[in-house]
Amino acid sequence: MKPRIKAPREDAAADGGAGVEDITLSEHIYRQLRRDIMRGAFAPGQSLRLELLRQRYGGSFSPIREALNRLRSERMVITTTSRGFRIAPLSVEEMRDACETRILIDCDALRRSLANADDAWEARLVGAFHALALAARRADAAPALDPDHEDALEARHQEFHQALIGACRSPWLLDLSAQLYAQTERYRRPARAQAMAYGHERDVGDEHRALLDAAVARDAGRAAALLAAHYRETAQVIERILSLPEGQAAA
């Protein structure tokens, strides 16, 4: 039997709550390691030595390997020729590929979602938008980039985009969308930090509001066009950040 632990709910920090849940040790390590990858605790391409991970997250090598293999399936880490693991590198080409694939998947899912939309779907979407707006205000008001605020913002951001396509009635589309979201999150989070530092002008809140308005109006064509433009603008910001000289990007 796999060892189990009591751990804070995955969304507890984002919600400001203190709930706990019973999960396997492997699941706990997976969540902690994935969170740290998203927060930039490990550099792209960095080797992940099992002993160092054991010291950082606890447990034996077996649940650590389980967590790493799960992250490998999500393309967060890659294997090396010596059967080790390292953080997956970041590249403009991969980011663009993920972005364009995400547009194909999410725009199709959005059109289907709007065709099936009802009052309950609209209520969830409006609620997700307001929760996202609140999280964005808290994150922007913080005197410095705060990991907990950024985690909460990312959780609310994902929930809004999930709500948009939530009525598509296709588990495959929803699953593929979630995978692609995770891939773009790896790029988007460090890019947000750099964009804040260098003052890239973009009102993402207005983009989300326009998406909400088009979706609530059941205007599938406009909503899909806005979603594609939203993703491509994000890709352009990320590409500019990745193209900065190494020293400047790390400043």
Residue ranges and their predicted role:
Residues 90-96, 114-118, 143-149, 191-199:
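A ubiquitous short alpha-helical element
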Residues 2-11, 21, 186-251:
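C-terminal all-alpha effector/ligand-binding and dimerization domain
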Residues 79, 157, 203-204:
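Short, flexible turn/loop "capping" segments at secondary-structure junctions
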Residues 1-115, 240-251:
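Short linear motifs at protein or domain termini
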Residues 27, 103, 126, 202-206:
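Amphipathic alpha-helical repeat elements characteristic of tetratricopeptide repeat
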